[in-house]
């Protein structure tokens, strides 16, 4: 049986806690998300792009997310809807 790699688990859990505390408003958890992406980036730098952690996006997706974040505001926002 293979061992599950939980590298960056504290950062992933911090995102979950932040989202729960803030009504799942991702824009209020930017620092936690950035911390996870930083941890995952360092993980892939050490282990290589084929490494895997249940707490990190795949290498290519992480690269895309980091690029998007460097270009500006990309956090999801909670939109209020009117029912009427």
Swiss-Prot record:
Any Pfam family the entry gives: CMC4
Q: Motif Cx9C motif 2 in this chain: where?
A: 29-39
Write down what this protein is called. Answer: Cx9C motif-containing protein 4, mitochondrial
Q: What lineage does UniProt assign to this protein's organism?
A: Eukaryota, Fungi, Dikarya, Ascomycota, Saccharomycotina
Instruction: Tell where it localizes.
Output: Mitochondrion intermembrane space
UniProt entry tagged with the keyword Mitochondrion: yes
Keywords annotated in UniProt: Disulfide bond, Mitochondrion, Repeat
Q: Which family does it belong to?
A: Belongs to the CMC4 family.
Q: Which Gene3D superfamilies match?
A: CytochromE C oxidase copper chaperone
Chief location of this protein within or outside the cell: mitochondrion
Any one GO CC term of this protein is:
mitochondrial intermembrane space
Chain location of the short sequence motif Cx9C motif 1 per the record: 8-18
SS bond list = 8-39, 18-29
InterPro entries noted in UniProt? CMC4 (IPR027179), Cys_alpha_HP_mot_SF (IPR009069)
All residue ranges annotated as the CHCH domain in the record: 5-47
User: Origin, by domain of life?
Assistant: Eukaryota
This protein's domain notes: The twin Cx9C motifs are involved in the recognition by the mitochondrial disulfide relay system.
């Amino acid at each position: 049986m293979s061992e599950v790699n939980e590298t960056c688990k504290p950062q992933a859990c911090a995102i979950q806690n932040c989202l729960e505390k803030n009504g799942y408003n991702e824009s209020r958890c930017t620092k936690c998300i950035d911390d996870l992406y930083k941890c995952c980036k360092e993980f892939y730098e050490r282990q290589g792009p084929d490494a895997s952690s249940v707490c990190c996006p795949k290498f290519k997706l992480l690269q895309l997310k980091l690029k998007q974040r460097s270009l500006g505001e990309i956090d999801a926002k909670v939109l209020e809807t009117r029912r009427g």
